[in-house]
Amino acid sequence: MTGKQHQKHEQKARQAQVKAQINRDKARSKLLRQREKLARRRARNRRQSEVRRGNQSKAQHDTQSETQRGTQSKSQRDNETGGTKNPTAHSTLPPQKTNAENAVRNSHSTVPELPKYSSVPARERLYGLRLHRETTASEDKSVTVAVTRAPKAERQRGGADE
């Protein structure tokens, strides 16, 4: 390399380093903004769920104290309150349904009824409503279902009530 080429190469390398630093700084600031926004949204959600649960007085107290605090940073607020409360105590997921409700949902099996390249039919698989009907059947029917559905090895050993 000649002197001029070497200079140009070094200049491009410096420019690449500066550009990389700028991009890193932009990404960091973007992540910080996202985290702050998420923290605000979670705090709002916690307050709303507390109000829904009937803890109105606590939520009102939190709202008043938050407006009094103004624009303090999170670390300053944490130092004043003695640390953060458990952030995982508030779930953003909807409440889980009961097993019976989940069983009634539209469910389907992706397993074919007749296995490919086989002349033997596949064993019956229970999903959705059929599973719900089988599991909520009367006690005597569920015993017979358990006997007929017992694994082959268990039937050979005589482990199922026959």
Swiss-Prot record:
Skewed-composition ranges (Basic and acidic residues): 22-37, 47-64, 122-142, 151-162
Keyword set includes Isomerase: no
Keywords: Gas vesicle
Polar residues bias spans: 65-74, 81-110
Induction behaviour: Transcribed from early-log phase, decreases as cells enter stationary phase, probably as a long gvpF-gvpM RNA. Highly expressed in 25% salt, poorly expressed in 15% salt, no gas vesicles are formed at 15% salt.
Region described as Disordered: spans on this chain: 1-162
Intracellular or extracellular location(s): Gas vesicle
Cellular component aspect of the GO annotation: gas vesicle
Note from the entry: Encoded in a 14-gene locus called mc-vac.
Quaternary structure and interacting proteins, as annotated: GvpF to GvpM interact with each other in vitro, and may form multi-subunit complex(es). Interacts with GvpC and GvpO.
Role played: Proteins GvpF to GvpM might be involved in nucleating gas vesicle formation. A minor component of the gas vesicle. Gas vesicles are hollow, gas filled proteinaceous nanostructures found in some microorganisms. They allow positioning of halobacteria at the optimal depth for growth in the poorly aerated, shallow brine pools of their habitat. Expression of a 9.5 kb mc-vac DNA fragment containing 2 divergently transcribed regions (gvpD-gvpE-gvpF-gvpG-gvpH-gvpI-gvpJ-gvpK-gvpL-gvpM and gvpA-gvpC-gvpN-gvpO) allows H.volcanii to produce gas vesicles.
Family, per entry: Belongs to the gas vesicle GvpI family.
Name listed for the protein in its UniProt record: Gas vesicle protein I
Organism: Haloferax mediterranei (strain ATCC 33500 / DSM 1411 / JCM 8866 / NBRC 14739 / NCIMB 2177 / R-4)
